[in-house]
Amino acid sequence: MFEKLQDVLCYRFADVRLLETALTHSSYANERGTEIEHNERLEYLGDAVLELTVSEQLFTRFPEAREGQLTRMRARLVSKPSLAELARELKLDTYLLLGKGEESQGGRTRSSVLSDAFEAILGAIFLDGGYAAAGKTVLHVFSSRWPQGAEAARTKDAKSTLQELTQRLFKERPVYTLLGSSGPEHEKIFKVRLLLPDGRALETEGQSVKRAEQKAAGLALELLEGESA
């Protein structure tokens, strides 16, 4: 029954009953008796698996991104509308087990039902095959959804964004100074000082001068953007 869906998910269940439970809406279980499990507990688990996997991927893919930027990207990726769109692409609507009332009220196309089912499937994969298996499925189905182009560039180049902002606010550029380095040759840590045109300074460290400068620029952006908010 679920052969094609498992192919699409890039995962074969050892216990396919977990997948069936992930696709079972509470309305279906309620109409047929308490012995039938529905997907709400799996959805709870899958939500945590999804958030951790996406957080880990964004952290790795965008080493220069500030915490606020990572949070915004993650929020867009795991939002209910985004997950519902993904569920439709996977044709989860054709596999859902719904109660008659939910079916008649359009539950098969409802975004909340679809997004919950997708998260429940991740929870089911986690229970069946572990975190690595669930993470692999996330990477597979999200392969074309990671931030690209202008959005990715914004997260990577805090220095350019800061320069544009300081030019606009102060008509001057920030100044970066290398204060020194420490540690063994293969694990050097570089310390950088950033001086804003208004006289305020920030000091940061990084595994390269570039990373330290980007980190300083990111902190300065948060400072200046917070003041102008």
UniProtKB/Swiss-Prot annotation:
Origin species: Oleidesulfovibrio alaskensis (strain ATCC BAA-1058 / DSM 17464 / G20) (Desulfovibrio alaskensis)
SUPFAM superfamilies (alphabetical): dsRNA-binding domain-like, RNase III domain-like
Cell compartments where the protein resides: Cytoplasm
Subunit-level organization: Homodimer.
Protein known as: Ribonuclease 3
Domain DRBM residues, every copy: 157-226
UniProt cross-references to Gene3D superfamilies, sorted A to Z: 3.30.160.20, Ribonuclease III domain (1.10.1520.10)
Gene name as annotated: rnc
Family: Belongs to the ribonuclease III family.
UniProt key word Secreted: no
SMART domains for the chain: DSRM (SM00358), RIBOc (SM00535)
Binding sites annotated in the UniProt record for Mg(2+): E43, D116, E119
Superkingdom of origin organism: Bacteria
Pfam families: dsrm, Ribonucleas_3_3
